[in-house]
């Protein structure tokens, strides 16, 4: 019995030691763009899109686990491996696409910050610049361990969406049915929403950030089992939160009158009739998610570009040691925050576009990942099992199919 307890304590200690990259990456996936996408899905289509969360969770676990494993085994980031195995030209093209997609995501995060604080009558011309400065100082003046602790603390606040979901008192029977009953409508808006839901849940930036964070934290192949548990727990948690966001908006908006919503702020206001707490919790959750992701997305982009093009990177390095890394991080924050402050800028379209761009870029990132992780000279005994490969290729085919369907429907002028 003593041996069993000792082994259990050892496993817990290992888990706590590696806790961070997988859990943070999965949970921050529910950023302001994600919250808007899930809110819009629930407001317009009710409980119908819930069925997508189950397969999305499975694919999210597989993709995140692959990145965590590659980082632990090779000690290199994803863009670093792409450059070494496929050459600088392909890597450069991938980085351009990733920067474009990530920039729209950064804009979405600062739009979320502005929207959440406008609910409390704080002007975006105050909230956005102050948040941008705070985000910049957090990473530039901290180190990996201190930044990670703050990120883990921020994860706790996502429970606000679960509480909001219960306060709205939705139709739980309908929610349960459509969680397992696939519904596919031949409708441009619905398919666009599905691509957005997949794109916001399994975003390309996540794969790059997770692998880089695993490497910087120093997780080794010996600690891989604990790291895998962390990834699985984080992925399940992120889609539980997504479920409650869809359910809250289906109960608060769709049940009364299905409609499009302009932003996540409108979703929060729709919860007011169900009590002040529902409104406050949803609003607080939106601010937390937005500022959390506003830290990580520029960080992920800086990691990816610097690794891919061979520059020094890492939060543990000082500015003079990794000037390009910190320049990119600063540039994305300034440009993202500045865009939100432009008058009459179409922020809502930008937010949904960012999620769809994620969905369009995702198949290409997954193709690189599955090729890399099956290289025996790179991964040794840690190559992918067959069913991982099968699931990943099926995801690639489905995402390409959804994208082509959306293009076809748009061309034919269907609603």
Locate the predicted segments by residue.
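Transmembrane alpha-helical segments of multi-pass small-molecule transport proteins
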Residues: 93-96, 119-140, 157-162, 324-338, ...
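Extracellular/periplasmic helix-exit of transmembrane alpha-helices
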Residues: 61-68, 73, 215, 236-266
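Juxtamembrane transmembrane-helix boundary signature
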Residues: 25, 52-86, 94-104, 296
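Hydrophobic alpha-helical segments and their helix-loop junctions in multi-pass secondary transporters
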Residues: 156-182, 191-212, 368-377, 402-414
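Loop-to-transmembrane helix boundary motifs in multi-pass membrane proteins
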Residues: 88-89, 125-128, 233, 237, ...
């Amino acid at each position: 019995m003593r041996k069993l307890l000792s082994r259990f304590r050892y496993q817990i200690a290992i888990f706590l030691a590696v806790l961070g990259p997988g859990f943070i990456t999965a949970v921050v996936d529910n950023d302001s763009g994600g919250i808007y996408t899930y809110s819009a899905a629930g407001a317009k289509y009710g409980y119908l899109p819930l069925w997508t969360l189950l397969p999305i969770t499975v694919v999210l676990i597989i993709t995140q686990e692959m990145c965590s494993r590659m980082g632990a085994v090779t000690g290199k980031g994803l863009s670093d491996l792409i450059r070494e195995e496929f050459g600088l030209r392909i890597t450069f093209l991938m980085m351009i696409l990733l920067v474009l997609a990530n920039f729209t995501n950064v804009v979405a995060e600062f739009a979320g910050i502005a929207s959440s604080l406008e609910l409390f009558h704080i002007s975006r011309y105050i909230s956005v610049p102050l948040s941008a400065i705070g985000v910049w100082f957090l990473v530039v003046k901290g180190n990996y361990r201190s930044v990670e602790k703050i990120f883990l603390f921020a994860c706790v606040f996502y429970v606000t969406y679960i509480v909001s979901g219960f306060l709205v008192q939705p139709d739980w029977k309908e929610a349960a049915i459509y969680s397992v009953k696939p519904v596919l409508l031949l409708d441009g808006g619905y398919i666009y929403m599905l691509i957005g839901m997949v794109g916001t849940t399994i975003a390309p930036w996540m794969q790059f950030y997770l692998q880089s964070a695993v490497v910087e934290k120093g997780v080794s192949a010996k600690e891989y089992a604990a790291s895998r548990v962390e990834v699985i727990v984080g992925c399940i948690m992120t889609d539980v939160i997504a479920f409650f966001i869809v359910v809250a908006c289906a109960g608060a908006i769709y049940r009364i009158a299905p409609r499009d919503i302009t932003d996540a702020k409108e979703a929060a206001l729709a919860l007011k009739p169900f009590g002040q707490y529902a409104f406050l919790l949803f609003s607080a959750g939106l601010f937390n998610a937005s500022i959390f992701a506003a830290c990580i997305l520029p960080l992920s982009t800086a990691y990816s570009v610097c690794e891919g093009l061979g520059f020094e990177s890492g939060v543990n390095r000082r500015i003079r040691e990794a000037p390009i890394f910190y320049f990119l991080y600063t540039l994305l924050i300034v440009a993202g925050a500045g865009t939100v402050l432009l008058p009459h800028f179409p922020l809502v379209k930008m937010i949904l576009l960012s999620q769809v761009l994620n969905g369009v870029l995702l198949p290409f990132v997954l193709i690189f990942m599955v090729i890399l992780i099956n290289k025996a000279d790179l991964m040794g005994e840690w190559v992918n099992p067959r069913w991982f490969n099968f699931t990943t290729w099926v995801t690639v085919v489905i995402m390409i199919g959804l994208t082509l369907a959306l293009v076809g429907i748009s061309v034919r002028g269907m609603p």
